[in-house]
Amino acid sequence: MIWDWGFTWKNLYVLSCYIALDLTAYSGTDGQGTGSVSVVDSHFNGVPYAITLSGHDPEPDIILDNLLVENSASVVLVSGGETILPGSTGALYFNSWGMGPQYFNSDGSGARKTGFINPAPNKPTSLLDTSTGRYFTRSKPQYENSSPIIATAHGISNDGTGDQTAAINSLLSSNIGSVIFFPAGIYLAEGTIEVPVGSIITGSGWSQIVAVGAYFYDQTSPKVLIQVGNEGDSGIVEISDMLFTVRGPTAGCILMEWNVHESTQGSAGMWGKMFPIAYGHSFDIS
């Protein structure tokens, strides 16, 4: 893994592999390494050097949460150097272990710590799968048995020209409960896209809805690009493989306002989503 990003790995099962996570790579002109890694609800078995670091400063921040390790000599180590968290020939269970900054106050004061976290962070039961005690997950819907409504067949342009706000809002409001497919492309919006409860939206290769225009100029009077439901709503909303971003002077843009609470566990969610700012080289932002 490279870049100064935060990675979360869940439900990993690594069996009989030399290394599970290699964090030794540095890239770019500034030699960026991995920013942080969280390994959650996972299992390493027969992995002698499970999480390998470079030894360069700064090291990535690491959180291990509900991790089972078996027959592994080292759990966290510096490549060719010291072992930070030793393993065992038997089974070890790590409820909560961390390496990184520990902050004491809101002013940012603190110190870098390495070791077990006690007490472990509280996990609200609403976030857990009651059958396993692990964090609840739901796989990305595929809609393989659906007949989607194709946005571009209903007067909506994906060629990066013209305001598509009204056309998209009309399509969404009149097709609640149906799968609406946005083919790959750029859909410009000069106003707020309103996503009603019951909407099912999917794209292709991160289909882009892009905020543009005077509506989003003023940072003292911010406006929302994607409004999901209204305050107090609950029910079903599914959004996948979409990208929401901005073009040009849009200091007053809030990319998304989410108002919908799940009616059943996992009924309201997003998969494969991106919210980049100044995405690419043609978005008129420096």
Where are these regions (language model features)?
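Beta-strand cores of modular interaction/reader domains in eukaryotic scaffold and signaling proteins
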Residues: 181-183, 202, 210
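Tight coil/turn sites that cap or link beta-strands
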Residues: 184-185, 198, 206
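Extracellular "leader-to-stem" segments immediately downstream of a signal peptide or signal-anchor
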Residues: 1-3, 7-178, 208, 214-219, ...
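C-terminal, well-structured subdomains that either form a transmembrane helix-short loop-helix hairpin
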Residues: 170, 179-192
